[in-house]
Curated annotation (Swiss-Prot):
Its EC number is 6.3.4.20. The keyword Zinc applies. GO terms for molecular function: ATP binding; ligase activity, forming carbon-nitrogen bonds; zinc ion binding. Zn(2+) binds at C191, C199, C202, C205. InterPro entries: QueC (IPR018317), Rossmann-like_a/b/a_fold (IPR014729). CDD domains: QueC-like (cd01995). It comes from Gloeothece citriformis (strain PCC 7424). Pathway: Purine metabolism; 7-cyano-7-deazaguanine biosynthesis. Its cofactor is Zn(2+). The gene is queC. PANTHER family: 7-CYANO-7-DEAZAGUANINE SYNTHASE. This is 7-cyano-7-deazaguanine synthase. Pfam families: QueC (PF06508). Catalyzes the ATP-dependent conversion of 7-carboxy-7-deazaguanine (CDG) to 7-cyano-7-deazaguanine (preQ(0)). Gene3D superfamilies: HUPs.
Length: 230
């Protein structure tokens, strides 16, 4: 029997790297897909390349989809300052990139169908996240219906399953799963900024640092994150 294939949306961050390791542990032949969308830096793409090597993923596609041409987010528009953590959790932050996950999953669906993959693995998380609307379970359910209706394989009665194994995990749970699966956490990149070292102050850094410290791995957190935890 042929080994099943899965496309992994690999950003280079902790969640997507852990998701890739889960797909491999589930018996899939992984096809990694990394997308540069015009964000402030290439750190994530560089991290994705390291993760692919460490996890032994043989097929890796990197594409550019430059959403910075129209901006609309602090991550794609240099004129908008990246906010520090601690914003109103009930508001969608300016770091939300309009339509990003919809664009990403659509491209992953194209790749999956072309490669005969049975699944698309996503590092989406709806617990410890920044309030993005395209990280919710109901969003994934809606996109699954779209995938079934818009693909040749779907019309033929089969499906390319969207799998988000971390969607209901806390960030602490994700850290612990990453450690168990041998994910190179130190090689992942979550910071919104593109400096030599993570800033430790943006929302993404703060969520990550708190989880690393709570899970018992403070040495993997930023120095700022360790100081703020006291």
């Amino acid at each position: 029997m042929n080994q099943p294939k899965a496309v992994i949306l690999l950003s280079g961050g902790l969640d997507s790297a852990t998701t890739a390791a889960i797909a491999l542990a589930s018996g899939y032949e992984a096809i990694a897909l990394s997308l540069f969308y015009g964000q402030r830096h290439h750190k994530e793409i560089e991290a994705a390349q390291k993760i692919v090597q460490v996890l032994g993923i043989k097929e890796h596609y990197s594409l550019e989809v430059n959403l910075s041409q129209w901006g609309g987010s602090a991550l794609t528009d240099q004129s908008i300052e990246v906010p520090k953590a601690g914003l109103n959790p009930h508001l969608i932050p300016i770091t939300y990139v309009p339509g990003r996950n919809t664009v990403f999953i659509a491209i992953a669906l194209s790749l999956a169908e072309a490669k005969g993959a049975q699944a698309i693995y996503l590092g989406i998380n709806a617990i410890d996240y920044s309030g993005y609307p395209d990280c919710r379970p109901e969003y994934l359910e809606a996109f699954q219906k779209l995938a079934n209706l818009s693909s040749k394989i779907g019309v033929e009665g089969k499906t390319i399953q969207l799998i988000a194994p971390l969607v209901k995990d806390s960030k602490v749970d994700i850290v612990r799963r990453a450690v168990r699966l041998g994910v190179p956490i130190a090689d992942t990149w979550s910071c919104y900024q593109g400096e030599d070292e993570p800033c430790g102050l943006c929302d993404s850094c703060r969520i990550r640092d708190r989880a690393l410290i709570e899970a018992g791995y403070p040495e993997l957190a930023t120095e700022i994150g360790r100081k703020l935890s006291h």
